[in-house]
């Protein structure tokens, strides 16, 4: 599929913005150091309105983007380091990259169920990380126009700047301005609210920051990894309907006194079980599940509405594969227990624990974290991922524009609000073949 760039612009804030260095909290620094990829798809429909050339008009989008960058001014900055080498944001107003491109031979339908493959990643501008961290835009955007009249919006957002909730706050505010309405909630830009206590006093062991379990073997995994190339991976997306989810829940005990499980805990237990079975994990194999949780409402008092930054804490259920695969209730119980632990006391302790670590970069999760026998499952179900209406209608799909690591998965809500949930996941290719069958056994 050929994609040709029509125009590439560095969009700066429409008005003068504060020239400051923004301190990053520990939560801003234990995230992957690349741009989080996501892609929106929009179909040309009767609700689009306007002249054909007006659909996703680049000039209109650029003007609104420049306006949005005024209150969200850190997004227009660059990464920098303070005198101690700690990464911070230099709010210098240098701008964000906005690309307009054409895919004259492709249509939205060519992307099928929108699995986050390399084809999807091509809809997002590539970022060159070889130079200094101050060299690249913190936000890269690409509007791609297809032959069918539809478009995609590819977004790459540097993770130090924002988590999913804050990133969507920006994108949705930009779309509001483009549509002609005002920003509903202004961003709150002060990350010192997430400073550790003085002195730091962690009160939990914080297993979420301990190394992930390795495969049980007579040969250390690191030894075998050096002698063999990593096995090929596959990426796919699977849709579970509302009735599928109901059948899953029916497998759990009910009635008075029965444990209560969130929808996430039930679905996560099913995915964890299917992945463990597909991988053929022995029953005694420890396996760790990484569940990203938003701390905004868990902290007391809650953070101000519009807090802009990373507030992701991680719940990490840990169990032997035999327990995970024995039945849905056992896995769901382990997951729910870990989620219920994530209260204000635990989250404040996590901030303190991170403050005492000599090198936060050593705790950044990556391929070594999620690979077999472990799993990361991030839910976007409570995020407003379908609210970016730039004036030409809501997206028909929004999801990850690629999955960086084997063993990482995302739960996505349906754009048409039919109660279905989709799981986008990356696994070793041979494991994916088995997972495709297992995931629908509900």
From Swiss-Prot:
It is an enzyme of class 2 (transferase). It comes from the Eukaryota. The active site is at residues 159, 389. Keywords: Acyltransferase, Transferase. Expressed in roots, leaves, stems and seeds. Its EC number is 2.3.1.-. GO terms for molecular function: acyltransferase activity, transferring groups other than amino-acyl groups; hydroxycinnamoyltransferase activity. Hydroxycinnamoyl transferase that catalyzes the transfer of an acyl from p-coumaryol-CoA to various acyl acceptors. Can use feruloyl-CoA and caffeoyl-CoA as acyl donors. Belongs to the plant acyltransferase family. This is Hydroxycinnamoyltransferase 1.
């Amino acid at each position: 599929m050929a994609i040709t760039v029509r125009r590439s612009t560095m969009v700066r804030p429409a008005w003068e913005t504060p020239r400051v260095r923004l301190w990053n909290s520990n939560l801003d620094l234990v995230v992957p150091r690349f741009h989080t990829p996501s892609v929106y798809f929009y179909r040309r429909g009767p609700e689009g309105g306007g002249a054909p050339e007006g659909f996703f008009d680049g000039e209109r989008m650029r003007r609104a983007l420049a306006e949005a960058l005024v209150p969200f001014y850190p997004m227009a900055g660059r990464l920098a380091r303070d005198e101690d080498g700690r990464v911070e944001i230099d709010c210098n107003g240098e701008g964000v990259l906005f690309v307009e491109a054409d895919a004259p031979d492709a249509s939205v339908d060519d992307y099928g169920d929108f699995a986050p493959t390399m084809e999807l990643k091509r809809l997002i501008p590539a970022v060159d990380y070889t130079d200094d961290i101050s060299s690249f835009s913190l936000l890269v955007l690409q509007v791609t126009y297809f032959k069918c009249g539809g478009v995609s919006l590819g977004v790459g957002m540097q993770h130090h700047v924002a988590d999913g909730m804050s990133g969507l706050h920006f994108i949705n505010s930009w779309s509001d301005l483009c549509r002609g309405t005002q920003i509903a909630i202004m961003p709150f830009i002060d990350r010192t609210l997430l400073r550790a206590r003085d002195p730091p006093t962690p009160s939990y062991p914080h297993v979420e920051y301990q190394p992930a379990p390795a495969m049980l073997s007579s040969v250390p995994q690191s030894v075998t990894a050096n002698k063999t190339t990593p096995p090929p991976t596959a990426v796919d997306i699977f849709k579970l309907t509302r009735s599928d989810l109901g059948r899953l829940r029916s497998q759990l005990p009910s009635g008075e006194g029965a444990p209560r499980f969130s929808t996430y805990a039930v679905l996560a237990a099913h995915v964890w079980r299917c992945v463990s079975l597909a991988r053929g994990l022995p029953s005694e194999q420890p396996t760790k599940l990484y569940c990203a949780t938003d701390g905004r409402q868990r902290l007391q008092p809650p953070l101000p509405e519009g807090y802009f930054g990373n507030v992701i804490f991680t719940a990490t259920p840990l169990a032997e594969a035999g327990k995970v695969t024995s039945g849905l209730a056992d896995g769901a119980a382990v997951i729910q227990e870990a989620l219920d632990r994530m209260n204000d006391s635990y989250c404040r302790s996590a901030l303190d624990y991170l403050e005492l670590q000599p090198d936060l970069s050593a705790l950044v999760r990556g391929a070594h974290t999620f690979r077999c026998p472990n799993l990361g499952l991030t839910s976007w179900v409570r995020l407003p991922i379908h609210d970016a209406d730039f004036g030409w209608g809501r997206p028909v799909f929004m999801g990850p524009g690629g999955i960086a690591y084997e063993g990482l998965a995302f739960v996505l809500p349906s754009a048409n609000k039919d109660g279905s949930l989709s799981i986008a996941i990356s696994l070793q290719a041979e494991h994916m073949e088995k997972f495709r069958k297992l995931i629908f056994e509900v």
